Every structure is written in C-alpha cells, then in structure tokens.
Amino acid sequence: MNYYELRIALNDFENWSDIFVAYLAEIGFESFVEEAPHLKAYIPEADYDGQALQALLAEQQQVAPVIDGFHLTLLAQQNWNANWESQFEPVYVGEQLRIVAPFHELAPFNGMELVILPKMSFGTGHHQTTHLICQTMFELDFNGKRVLDMGAGTGVLSLLAEKLGAQEIRAIEIEAWSAENILENIALNGATKVEAIHGGAEAIGEQPYDLILANINKNVLLSQLSLYAAVMLPNAVLLLSGFFSTDAPDLIAAAAQLGLQHQQTLDRENWAVLKFIKQ
C-alpha cells in the first residue's frame, strides 16, 4: 500500500500542531510525526481526497494564518515504513509505563513496558490522547475483567489492559494493516488475552463488557456511543478520548441520554479523556 505524506510548516507549531492533527484525522489522515516547525501527516493513496485537503487548508488560513507552506509526496511502502520507524522515540507515562520499539536499546525500567512495532498505526503513545488514556487506565481495576478496545490502532491499550490484569480483551480496528500490526505487537509482548479483529462497529457484537476503551474522534464516538452503552454491564466503565477538551460537553450530554454517568475529565494540552459509569 502506498501512502501520501503531507508536510506542513506551521509558524506557531506548539499551539497548532495538535489542532491540525485532529482536523487532518477527520479527512482520513491516519498517522502523524511532529518535527517542529513541521507536521508530517500520512494517508493511504486510495483514501486521499485532494479537494477536502485544499478546503481544509484554505479554511484554516482564513481562521488563523499559521501555515507557512506545505508539500505532498507519494511514498512507496518500503520507504514510509522505514521513515516511520526512524522517527519513533520511547514514550514514558510517568514512572508507570514505558512504550518502546523493538530496535530501542535502553536502560532497565522499573515500571511496565510495552514493545510496539510502530509502523503507521495510531496509538504508539506519542499522541496526547493515547498518553492520557494510558495514564487513566492505571487508576482502574482491570483484574479478571472483559475489555473492549475500539479503534485499537497498534493495540497499545489492549496490551496495557492485559498487563493490568484483564481476562479477555477484544481489540477492534477498521484498518486492515493496523489490525495486522496488532497481531505483530501481540506476539512481541507475549500477550495471550488480546483478540485482534479487523472491523468496525458491526464487530462489537452483543457480549457484555466490564470496561470499554475508545480513543477515536468526536464524530465517530458520537455515532457509536449507543452501541457501547448497549454492551456495558451495570457499573461498567467507559473511557473516551481522541477529541479536544472543548468537545467534552457534547459527549457528556450524549452519554447522559444513554444512562452513562460522567465521573471524571482529564486534560492534557487541550485534549481530553472522559470517564463514564453505566448506571
């Protein structure tokens, strides 16, 4: 599979890079690399919509002229895999978790460690939302629990759930190559409780869950929220992330209509994670 690489130069990188990540994700871009002042974004060749990209960039320039320039390049598969891996740096979630790639040579770490073959999948831990939801997971009881991970990406949340004691984890990912990446990461970590499934909302099924993790984006979360609620056991926990802090009220209101009680909001650099309990 070939990918397009979009390279955008931002003149206020610190304040705008995460915002552009969210907007580009809404038009199909899947993976991102930050090299200030440049943001690199990647999308499968078959999914690229030039008109949608031009409209987005033009609209953003009218709202806030922070784009100094951009360049689009079609990359062959063997090139983007090597490029992505070369950019991947270890991720630390406090002193509790370290996320590394197989090629990293690091000093011993006292916390939990996950080995992730980065490739192009979303969810290596670099993005604020993945970092936030990993941090929040350490506050929950996973022992013996059944877990659903929607939009699993690399499978990092599923793998962490197993390390935290979950008995069964269903990792659903709509992109075929990401679902394959989950299988690779399951093998790298010796995981035995994670089931990787290529599919979308239709793959949720009817079996009940104790915990649901969904790190996607606001629009997808709103469209799938009722499906999550339908398979949550009484007192089950739902963690939502992948959206701006300013979007949280819309998700909280929608969840309340489904009997999901808002318990907690955590923020990190304008991104949020929401915790709900099934009443």
Model-assigned labels for residue ranges:
Residues N2-P108:
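N-terminal auxiliary segments of SAM/dcSAM-dependent transferases
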Residues V91-Q128, C134:
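Proteins enriched for Cys/Gly/acidic motifs involved in redox and nucleic-acid/cofactor modification
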Residues E95-L97, K145, A236:
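Surface-exposed loop/turn positions
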Residues G28-V33, G144, L260-Q264:
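A short linear hydrophobic-aromatic micro-motif
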Residues I174-Q279:
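S-adenosylmethionine
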